[in-house]
Amino acid sequence: MPLLDSFRVDHTIMPAPAVRVAKVMQTPKGDDITVFDLRFCVPNKSMMSEKGTHTLEHLFAGFIRNHLNSPTVEIIDVSPMGCRTGFYMSLIGTPSEQEVAVAWKKAMEDVLKVENQSDIPELNLYQCGTCAMHSLDEAKDIARDILKSQIGVMSNKELYLSEEKLKSLGN
């Protein structure tokens, strides 16, 4: 099985909250697609709650679009990581990590403005696969944690695992 890019970085030294360009690729027509690692929690130290992550998924995807989409950037998808330490964001364009960090911060401020559970978008049986698994309070706790710290920028060069280390890990 091929080793995915996300497993080529050293999770033991990964900071949070922080932004990382996880991948850049070009479509056959020449459009740039950038995948960002938006790390909310330090891996293997903490993780977002299940209900909070799910609620944040519903809120964050819309709010960050409000602050980052532009004539040169269009978000394709914002999805939580299975490890619940962050989100991946795929988009057309190449915004800087700093631009992404600013939009992320503004989106977290927007989360804190949501007043009621009933204000969570697409929270119904028809549009959500597990509509009972939500908590606005837990999503707000996650947002507050992000806003307490400055969102940093991760360096792939510093995080990449050497070929020697990957081999020693069985890859």
From Swiss-Prot:
Chain ranges passing through the membrane: none
Protein name as annotated: S-ribosylhomocysteine lyase
PANTHER family, A to Z: S-RIBOSYLHOMOCYSTEINE LYASE (PTHR35799:SF1)
Keywords (A to Z) from UniProt: Autoinducer synthesis, Iron, Lyase, Metal-binding, Quorum sensing
InterPro entries named in the record: LuxS_sf, Metalloenz_LuxS/M16, S-ribosylhomocysteinase
EC number(s) given by UniProt: 4.4.1.21
Pfam family, one: LuxS
An MF annotation (GO) of this entry: S-ribosylhomocysteine lyase activity
Entry superkingdom: Bacteria
Biological process (GO), any one: quorum sensing
Family per similarity comment: Belongs to the LuxS family.
Cofactor detail note: Binds 1 Fe cation per subunit.
Assembly and binders: Homodimer.
Binding site for Fe cation: H54, H58, C128
Catalytic reaction equation(s): S-(5-deoxy-D-ribos-5-yl)-L-homocysteine = (S)-4,5-dihydroxypentane-2,3-dione + L-homocysteine
Record SUPFAM superfamilies: LuxS/MPP-like metallohydrolase (SSF63411)
Listed cofactors: Fe cation
